[in-house]
Regions:
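N-terminal intrinsically disordered/low-complexity leader segments
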Residues: 1-19, 26, 204-213
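Helix-turn-helix
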Residues: 20-23, 27-65, 69
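Solvent-exposed, amphipathic alpha-helical segments
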Residues: 23, 27-34, 81, 112, ...
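Hydrophobic/aromatic-rich alpha-helical bundle segments in the mid-to-C-terminal region
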Residues: 127-131, 135, 149-197, 204-213
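Amphipathic alpha-helical segments used for helix-helix packing
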Residues: 105-128
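Hydrophobic alpha-helical connector segments
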Residues: 69, 79-110, 160-167, 190
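Hydrophobic/aromatic residues within well-ordered alpha-helical segments
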Residues: 63, 70, 74, 78, ...
Length: 213
């Protein structure tokens, strides 16, 4: 069947294909967060978005593909908002802002990450796209660290890939250990993160920061 015909079948009357896709992604984030990945049927997401199952499949080949697509969309939106809030912010300051928000975030992306990680352990259909997604996040973080090294914010002796892995592990851990399970004081958490980020600086810069304190 012609691809354009398939996409036209997946549209809501008076709504573009892009708007239908966005509606499906928002519905998926809400339904996955409410019912979990295993407890969610494709029909549940289609109904929440106000479309048919056929319309959903015109945009996404499977429930697993929809989960990861929702993750990518919400993740990009959060990052875009952070950059827009302060375009002149340094990379290490950006990492601190993201880090400070981790324990108290209530965004759909955090819920989607948890559902994706849990489902990936037992479902290969989820594991494959989740590996790709995590790889993309790690690559983005590593590029960010390389840019910080070029600006003498981060020690060139440190591995960007290792720092990216640490950041991912921190983000995934705080998504799993929510404030309801174990709260942490905002000021104490921020102080700890500040020390960690300061330790990433080149030795001369780090020594100057320590002397200033």
């Amino acid at each position: 069947m012609n691809v354009l015909l398939i996409l036209s079948m997946g549209r809501i009357a008076g709504v573009t294909a892009a708007e239908t896709r966005e509606r499906l992604l928002r519905a998926a984030a809400d339904v996955f967060a409410d019912r979990g990945y295993d407890g969610t049927r494709v029909a549940d997401i289609a109904a929440a978005a106000g479309v048919s199952n056929g319309a959903l499949y015109a945009h996404f080949g499977s429930k697993a593909e929809l989960l990861v697509a929702a993750l990518r969309t919400h993740g990009r939106r959060l990052l875009a908002d952070l950059f827009a809030a302060d375009p002149d912010r340094s990379i290490t300051e950006l990492l601190l802002v993201i880090g400070r928000s981790l324990p108290k975030r209530r965004d759909p992306c955090g819920n989607l990450v948890v559902e994706g990680l849990v489902a990936a352990r037992r479902d290969q259909d989820v594991a494959r796209p989740m590996r790709d997604y995590m790889g993309e996040r790690a690559d983005w973080l590593a590029e960010l660290i390389r840019a910080a090294q070029a600006d003498v914010e981060v020690d060139r002796a440190l591995s960007p890939d290792a720092i990216a892995h640490f950041c991912l592990s921190l983000a995934m851990g705080t998504a799993l250990v929510t404030p309801a399970l174990h709260p942490v004081d905002d000021d104490e958490w921020g102080l700890l993160l500040g020390r960690i980020v300061a330790a990433l600086a080149p030795s001369a810069v780090s020594a100057q920061a320590g002397a200033a304190q």
